[in-house]
Structures are given as C-alpha cells and as structure tokens.
C-alpha cells in the first residue's frame, strides 16, 4: 500500500483503519507512517495522526522505538500540526520516556500548561506525561502540583479539570 496515496484520498476513519490494519506491528511500515506524520505535508501529517494512534493502540513497540525521534520533533518543531502534537503527546503518556529526553520533555510539558493557546487534550496529556516523569524524579512533584493548581484556576475545561484534580490527588499522596 502506498501510504501517502491512501492518506491523500480523504480524511476518514475508514482510511485510518485500513492503514492500521496494513501497518499492524510491521516496524518498516510504521517507520514509513511516522515519516509522513513528521513530513512537510501538513494535510497528510494530520491524516496520519489518527492511523498512528490506532497502530499504537494495536502495538506500542514500534512507537517506542521511534520515541526519541518523535520527542525531538515535538520539542523542536513548532510548525507541527496540532493533530500531530496531540498524537505524539497522547502516546507518550503510556510509554516509558527515554531517560535522555525526560528533562527536556518535562520542561516542555510545564510550558504547555502555562500557554493559553494550547488545546485541552494537549494540556491534559502533558499533565500526565509530566506526572509520569515525576515518578522517576520525586523532587519535581511540588513544582508540577503548583503548575497544575494554577492551570485549574485559569482553565475551566472539563478535560483539564478532571485530569488536573486526579493528578493533584496522586501528587498529594506521594
């Protein structure tokens, strides 16, 4: 299957599912899909994001192997389509973050919490990623708790409120 041609057809659940069934756990195919996700064509990248999520849900191993590359793009490319950023941070909540990337990713997640123009999903996922990193660095928990608390005061979105309250409760228990 030519992934670019398939994604160019339309932005649909049917096409994303077809790509997920084609890619499954095949690392080479997943690498090709990630290349589109991080590519210059924003429309194709946006369309690839859903397929990457479904491939991740099927098998997270290929995503974990690409994690350093995806984290680097998330940290250094402000031009990434919001769907691509959401896809990357969504899946980073679930995997173990490579040690070499934890500090920079934690800082970026905190920065996201303070940005009013970020989407609800990206903020909620960023809270979780930062919390997961705090499990390895307990000294960061107080800083994260304060950042979440401030975010709860300024952001009335149910998604941010729900995730924030749950994480503050977990941080208080620690």
Indicate where each model-derived feature is located:
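Alpha-helical scaffold domains
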Residues: 1-174
């Amino acid at each position: 299957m030519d992934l670019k041609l398939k994604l160019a057809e339309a932005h649909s659940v049917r096409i994303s599912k077809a790509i997920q069934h084609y890619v499954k756990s095949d690392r080479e195919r997943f690498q090709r899909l990630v290349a589109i996700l991080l590519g210059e064509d924003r429309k194709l990248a946006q369309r690839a994001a859903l397929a990457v999520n479904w491939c991740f849900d099927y098998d997270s191993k290929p995503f974990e192997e690409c994690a350093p590359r995806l984290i680097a793009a998330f940290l250094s490319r402000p031009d990434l389509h919001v769907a691509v950023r959401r896809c990357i941070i969504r899946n980073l909540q679930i995997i173990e973050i490579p040690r070499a990337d934890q500090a920079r990713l934690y800082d970026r997640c905190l920065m996201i919490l303070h940005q009013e123009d970020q989407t609800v999903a990206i903020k909620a996922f960023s809270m979780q990623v930062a919390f997961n990193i705090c499990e390895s660095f307990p000294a960061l928990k107080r800083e994260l708790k304060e950042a979440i608390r401030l975010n709860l005061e300024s952001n009335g979105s149910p998604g941010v409120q729900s995730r924030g309250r749950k994480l503050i409760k977990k941080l208080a228990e620690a």
